[in-house]
Regions:
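Conserved redox-active cysteine motifs that mediate thiol-disulfide chemistry
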Residues: 71-88
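Short pre-active-site segment immediately N-terminal to redox-active cysteine/selenocysteine motifs
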Residues: 65-67, 71-75, 145
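Bacterial Sec-dependent N-terminal signal peptides
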Residues: 1-30, 179
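N-proximal helix/coil linker or "cap" segments that precede and/or mark the start of modular domains
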Residues: 22-45, 60-63, 114-117, 174
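A short beta-strand-turn-helix
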Residues: 46-67
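Conserved segment of the thioredoxin-like fold in thiol-based oxidoreductases
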Residues: 91-133, 143-146
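Thiol/disulfide oxidoreductase modules built on the thioredoxin-like
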Residues: 121, 129-176
Length: 180
């Protein structure tokens, strides 16, 4: 009787482990990337202020070009892990005409600028210098996790939103960017 109970208990524990290991060890990008703007949605416009453009320029002024927007922060461990991958994407696709825009949720301007400088993030960088949850852009783009990437097409519409840098790389590689 006890042997039968122990056998059932072990079988139950093994089954539970197998079922949960699919989610625990699995891909969390579906959960964190849920609720992002859908393909074809007009990208919410915003004005980007940088040291080189202190008067600012609108995201919509980049229509006619693909734009990759990366929502990130210097204090974010996942963003830090993806820095080299983002630099690789920039080196690969910026020469093909993709405009890269980093939107940071940093609140300390000096730390943010130091991270950009130390890591050679050579694309457009912008921050409202507000906490993530207080950012108007976080709300407009339904950001639940960082880094989050959006590819905007030449007409200003969302092609894809994702928390997976590799998925964005695959998408960019599938586009006919050489033919512009």
């Amino acid at each position: 009787m006890i042997h039968h109970f122990i056998t059932k208990l072990i079988a139950t524990v093994v089954a539970a482990f197998c079922l949960t290991s699919c989610t625990i060890g699995g891909d969390d990008t579906d959960e964190y990337g849920s609720g992002l703007l859908q393909k074809g949605t007009p990208a919410p416009d915003f004005t980007i202020y940088t040291d080189s453009h202190p008067e600012g320029f609108a995201l919509s002024s980049l229509q006619g070009q693909y734009v990759l927007i990366e929502f990130w922060a210097s204090w974010c461990p996942d963003c830090q892990k993806e820095t080299e991958n983002m630099k690789r994407l920039y080196a690969t696709y910026a020469p093909l005409g993709v405009v890269f825009v980093g939107v940071s949720f940093d609140t300390d301007k000096e730390e943010w600028q130091q991270y950009i400088h130390d890591n050679g993030l050579d694309w457009i960088q912008y921050s409202e210098l507000k906490p993530w949850k207080e950012s108007t852009l976080s709300t407009a783009y339904n950001i639940k996790w960082i880094p989050t990437l959006y590819l905007i097409d030449k007409e200003g519409r969302v092609v894809q939103g994702t928390v997976d840098v590799n998925a964005m790389d695959t998408l960019l590689a599938s586009l006919n960017l050489n033919g512009q």
